[in-house]
């Protein structure tokens, strides 16, 4: 009887300890508002397409681990809102979008609430495209996260001169 009770208590303790463990990487909740603190491209982005100002990105977690992403940008004197779904793959931190033409890798940094989002694929079916963003849950500068982003750039064989730090706007407002 004592051994049965001890077994039940032990199983209960294991269940409690398992519940307290951090979730695996593929269960990270990316929902919320994100700010692009720095960006890099693989050299295929023309200078006139480099944004001087960026706005917060909204991510909503969907069923099956997919992410609905809303990006707001300034284009030809107007605010444009663009929504797309990042489809979760079997590989943790890897998503596809735009009918599998783009692959997005999400990499955690050692800095709390900072991730690197790197999108690669074909642009208009022709040239290879790659862009990375250091994203944080707040808009403040973080030198440690920036240093990790620079190391990411080197690791990906990208050029530091293709890195830029855009101004972060609170929200896109059209002027009259």
UniProtKB/Swiss-Prot annotation:
Note the SS bond partners.
Answer: 79-172
A Gene Ontology molecular-function term? Answer: small molecule binding
Residue ranges annotated as transmembrane are: none
In which tissues has expression of this protein been reported? Expressed in the liver (at protein level). Expressed in epididymis.
Q: Which residues form the signal peptide?
A: 1-19
Entry's CDD domains? lipocalin_1_3_4_13-like
Q: Where in the cell is it found?
A: Secreted
Its cellular-component GO annotations read:
extracellular space
Any Gene Ontology biological process: regulation of glucose metabolic process
Give the UniProt keywords, A-Z: Disulfide bond, Glycoprotein, Secreted, Signal, Transport
Q: Which domain of life is it from?
A: Eukaryota
Residues annotated as glycosylated are 42, 124
Family under the similarity heading: Belongs to the calycin superfamily. Lipocalin family.
Additional record remark: May be involved in the development of hepatic steatosis during obesity.
What the protein does comes down to: Involved in the regulation of systematic glucose homeostasis and insulin sensitivity. Involved in the regulation of liver lipid levels by positive regulation of hepatic lipogenesis and negative regulation of fatty acid beta-oxidation; via downstream transcriptional regulation of CPT1A and hepatic lipogenic program gene expression. May regulate hepatic lipogenesis and fatty acid beta-oxidation in an autocrine or paracrine manner.
Provide the protein name: Odorant-binding protein 2a
Q: By which gene is this protein encoded?
A: Obp2a
